[in-house]
């Protein structure tokens, strides 16, 4: 595959863009972002980057708390570790995250990538009201050894509360059958929500085993490095110090004022420039070991950019095809984990690496991101 676009520092973005017109468009966008100080304005919570409407600017500025999450939640690591150890010591063997969208997708990424940590809980994510999906989530689990995590920013998410009601009934029946003297299934439930009315809206909130209150200025799909992601991480046995250190390392790199040196800004500006050039579909090609990040990215990208009749259409889990199968409207992002098995080859035996090389040669932009360890997913939560 040809060399990456030279405008970017090697550790910022590996972008293979053979089409000269697309390369020029990206370079022009980088120059504009630098001239208009996009990076500094983002970290200053300057809503004028996105809108000229003062009301919209204020709303946006009040939703940028995710910029502080890696630092703010570092102080919570001892308490989170104690919580995880306490749940394990209490005899819990599994946990179910009952949430939708942003409240469930980051936990799903972590539950899949760290599912083999010996001695810790099995974590499953319930984010579909399909009865078959609900039964699958509970299949094989002991209701009396399963912690239910009710995750809802608003406290009124219909699906999350429906999952809670279903879990309540299952646990109540199991308690009666076992002759247990616990007064309430609430002993086996916790909540992750916002303070105030959000908490008050959750049924049985005053009797739950524990409640974790998230910052109000963090939107659901940006909450991976808040309690939404960190509470499940504590139950999976993830090294929280290392996890947040990875996020802080990436956050520090995203303070580089020059877009060419900034992993987050380089990615965002590139995708924006390519979208303006007609590349409005992003196909993620991830190693199976980190494939669940695709669902998280789908929601993050689609819900964040899909406004006012425009946006990038993310595509995850689609088998990679030959170059001739695609119109000139695609961007491909390869997410690889060192030492992990790559995506399966095509029935004809063509590997993902060979297909991506052919796609780049045919003029499709190919961006490559490599993780040294699953713990580096924390950095990707920041970068994207």
Please tell me what each predicted stretch does.
Residues 157-164, 343-347:
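Glycine/threonine-rich flexible loop motifs
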Residues 65-85, 108-151, 156, 163, ...:
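Glycine-rich oxoanion-binding loops at beta->alpha junctions
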Residues 95-110, 222-229, 380:
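Conserved phosphate/anionic-ligand binding catalytic regions in large, soluble enzymes, centered on
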């Amino acid at each position: 595959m040809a060399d990456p676009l030279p405008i970017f520092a090697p550790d910022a973005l590996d972008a293979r863009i053979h089409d000269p017109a697309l390369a020029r468009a990206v370079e022009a966008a980088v120059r504009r972002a630098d001239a208009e100080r996009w990076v500094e304005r983002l970290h200053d919570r300057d809503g004028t980057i996105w809108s000229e409407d003062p009301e919209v600017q204020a709303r946006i500025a009040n939703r940028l708390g995710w910029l502080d999450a890696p630092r703010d939640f570092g102080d919570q690591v001892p308490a989170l570790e104690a919580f995880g150890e306490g749940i394990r010591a209490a005899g819990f063997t599994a946990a179910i995250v009952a949430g939708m969208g942003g409240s469930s997708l980051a936990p799903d990424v972590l539950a899949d990538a760290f599912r083999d940590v010996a001695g810790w809980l099995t974590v499953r994510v319930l984010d579909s009201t399909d009865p078959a999906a609900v039964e699958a989530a509970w299949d094989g689990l002991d209701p009396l050894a399963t912690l239910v995590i009710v995750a809802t920013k608003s406290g009124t998410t219909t699906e999350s509360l429906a999952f809670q009601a279903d879990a309540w009934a299952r646990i109540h029946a199991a308690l009666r059958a076992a002759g247990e003297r616990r007064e309430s299934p609430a002993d086996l439930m916790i909540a992750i929500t916002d303070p105030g009315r959000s908490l008050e809206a959750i049924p049985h909130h005053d009797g739950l085993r524990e409640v974790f209150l998230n910052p109000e200025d963090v939107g659901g799909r940006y909450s991976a490095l808040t309690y939404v992601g960190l509470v499940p991480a504590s139950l999976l046995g993830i090294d929280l110090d290392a996890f947040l250190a990875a996020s802080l390392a990436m956050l520090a790199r995203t303070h580089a004022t020059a877009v060419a040196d900034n992993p987050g800004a380089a990615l965002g500006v590139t995708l924006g420039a390519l979208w303006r050039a007609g590349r409005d579909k992003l196909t993620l090609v991830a190693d199976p070991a980190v494939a669940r990040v695709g669902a998280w990215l789908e929601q993050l990208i689609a819900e964040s950019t899909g406004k006012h009749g425009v946006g990038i259409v993310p595509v995850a889990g689609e088998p990679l095809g030959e170059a001739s199968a695609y119109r000139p409207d695609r961007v491909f992002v390869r997410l690889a984990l060192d030492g992990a098995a790559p995506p399966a080859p095509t029935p004809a035996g063509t590997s993902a690496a060979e297909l991506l090389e052919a796609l780049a040669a045919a003029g499709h932009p190919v961006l490559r991101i490599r993780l040294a360890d699953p713990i580096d997913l924390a950095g990707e939560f920041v970068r994207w």
